[in-house]
């Protein structure tokens, strides 16, 4: 998880504060999350936040850190998933800028099958309906 965030930063895909990662441990009611407020280029295993899923959701961290503010999205994706074990949620700076500029990213990546096949950008990003309180 930490290496994924560090590599995304190293490649220039994110700034130090963009994105989060979660992993659900197989056959366990446990999800590990990257913490809130920690620079992604220095995050380490000791900083990860553990979310125990039971009748109540409980968080714990060796360094007393809070989970990502988007923990609920990670939980909703992973709680009943049978094949998905991880969520990588990043906000690439260049993609965000291009979307705000009105570029049609879906059409732009078609000539690049390695991007088109495996990456979702713009309006073709699968989305979860808004959460209601």
Which residues does each predicted region cover?
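Glycine-rich flexible loops
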Residues: 1-133
